[in-house]
Amino acid sequence: MSGPTRAGFEGSYLGANDRISDLAIMECKICWTPYDPASGDEFRQVLPGTPFTALPEDWHCPNCDAPKAQFIVQSDPGAPALLEQNRVDAQVSALVADFREIWHSKMRDVPLVNKALSIEAVGFRSHEGRGLGVLVSPWFMNLIQLPAAGEDWSGLIPGVKEDLEFPSGLYEFIHNRREMVGGYKACSLYPTMGDFQTQMQAVDLARAVMIELFKAENRAETDRAAEIRASRTAELAALEAAEAEKAETAARAEAMAQPTRRRLISAGLAGEDEGAAE
């Protein structure tokens, strides 16, 4: 049995309202009268700024009275942004599906989870060509970055750290991979979720994060660059010290195994001198 049909419009977009943006300028294919969202429809008292998809179902062409279904796309300045958002939305759906599967199969009975919460993606949008948003779950809240169109992140090594710059500061992301969404990068906002009483409370905070993240005035408070640099410097110093100690030990062992010519020549004499001294 086929599902219910959805009212749409004719033309190259095949009546799919979700494939035109709010900026799309439509025109009647009977009399070629345009509908421009910026102008609205004074005849039907439709306010300027009303998208074609938001017009009442009984709206008709103000010139020839043709129904909405007889309108086609004249131009759509917002189409690229809409297509990009649709791409990000598809990635986000896979991300949410991955973590819902983890929740139901592995995490539901773990004592530390907050069962008042659920898996929800909040505020995802395209930023510099990559999907960015907050993932809320019963056991964590993370800022997530997803790959751009054409980028292959399947080779990301889980656990590798990367610093990403935003207007509010420098943030540390950890690489990861999941079966459905593939590679992604995550910045921990809340490693546990016990402080949240409701899903709405967690979602409201996630929305606030997506606003504050892009405010340069928050940089002094949120910039973790110095902290991250200090941590990395300490890690590198410890690594260099370990390597230096290893090299010194190896050099000492090599020296013992391969004595210098002076030692070989003087070794016997030293023994004789010691015997004479006794």
Swiss-Prot record:
Positions of region (Disordered): 250-278
InterPro entries: NiFe-hyd_HybE, NiFe-hyd_HybE_sf, Rubredoxin-like_dom, Rubredoxin_dom, Rubredoxin_ET, Rubredoxin_Fe_BS
Record keywords: Electron transport, Iron, Metal-binding, Transport
Gene3D superfamilies per the UniProt record, alphabetical: 2.20.28.10, [NiFe]-hydrogenase assembly chaperone, HybE (3.30.1460.40)
Residues that hold Fe cation according to the record: C28, C31, C61, C64
Every Rubredoxin-like domain range: 23-74
GO molecular function: electron transfer activity; iron ion binding
Cofactor binding, note field: Binds 1 Fe(3+) ion per subunit.
Cofactor: Fe(3+)
A Pfam entry, by short name: NiFe-hyd_HybE
PANTHER family: RUBREDOXIN, RUBREDOXIN-1-RELATED
Family: In the C-terminal section; belongs to the HupJ family.
The protein's name: Probable rubredoxin HupJ
Source species: Rhodobacter capsulatus
